[in-house]
C-alpha cells in the first residue's frame, strides 16, 4: 500500500517485496501514477491492482489492460455504483475483476455483512453476472477505526475477518500476523 503517494518510493518498495516473495501481490493506491510505477517494477508478475473508483476507473482500466492485471473495484456501501462500475469496466475491456463493497468494523458492520450477502446472492441465485466476481474484504480497517490498544484492534480485525469468511469473502486484507487473528 502506498502511504507516501510517491511513485519512486512505491516502485522501490514493490521491487524489494517482489524480490523476497513468490506469493501473490496486491498493489494498493487510488493514484494511477503511483500504481503504474509499481507495475513497472514487476513486469512479469500479475498483481491485483487496488482499486478503481468512480473517479479513477478509466486510468485504472488502462493499467489493468496494459499490464494484464486483475483490477479491484471499490464502491463503499453503494452496490448500485459497484454494479455500474463493473458494467463500465467490462464494456471497456477489463475482464479480471474483484469487487470491494467496503468493509466497516464498527459503525456500518451490519451494512458490510448485508452487502457481501446481497452481492453473492445476486451473482449466484439471481444470475446477475455483473455481481458474480470474487469479493475482497479489508478487515485491516479495524486498525484505522479503533484507534485504541493493539489488542482491541487485532480482536476487531479477527471478528470482522470471521464474519466476512462466513459471508462469502474470497480475499481478505489483514494487518495482524498473530496466529489467533488469522484463524478465520
Question: Language-model segments: which ranges?
Answer:
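Active-site beta->alpha loop and helix N-cap motifs at the rims of alpha/beta catalytic domains
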Residues: 1-83
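Catalytic alpha/beta core domains of metabolic enzymes, predominantly
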Residues: 55-184
Amino acid at each position: 500500500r502506498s502511504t507516501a503517494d510517491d511513485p519512486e518510493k512505491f516502485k522501490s518498495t514493490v521491487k524489494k517485496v517482489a524480490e523476497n516473495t513468490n506469493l501473490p501481490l496486491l498493489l494498493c493506491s487510488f493514484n494511477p501514477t503511483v500504481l503504474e510505477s509499481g507495475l513497472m517494477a514487476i513486469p512479469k508478475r500479475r498483481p491485483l491492482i487496488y482499486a478503481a473508483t468512480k473517479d479513477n476507473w478509466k486510468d485504472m482500466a488502462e493499467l489493468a489492460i496494459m499490464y494484464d492485471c486483475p483490477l479491484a473495484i471499490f464502491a463503499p456501501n453503494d452496490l448500485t455504483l459497484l454494479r455500474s462500475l463493473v458494467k463500465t469496466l467490462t464494456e471497456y475491456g477489463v475482464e479480471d475483476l474483484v469487487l470491494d463493497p467496503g468493509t466497516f468494523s464498527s459503525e456500518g458492520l451490519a451494512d458490510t455483512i448485508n452487502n457481501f450477502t446481497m452481492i453473492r446472492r445476486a451473482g449466484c441465485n439471481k444470475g446477475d453476472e455483473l455481481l458474480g466476481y470474487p469479493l475482497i474484504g479489508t478487515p485491516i480497517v479495524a486498525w484505522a477505526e479503533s484507534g485504541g490498544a493493539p489488542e482491541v484492534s487485532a480482536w476487531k480485525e479477527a471478528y470482522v475477518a470471521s464474519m466476512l469468511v462466513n459471508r462469502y469473502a474470497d480475499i481478505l486484507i489483514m494487518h495482524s500476523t498473530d496466529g489467533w487473528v488469522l484463524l478465520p
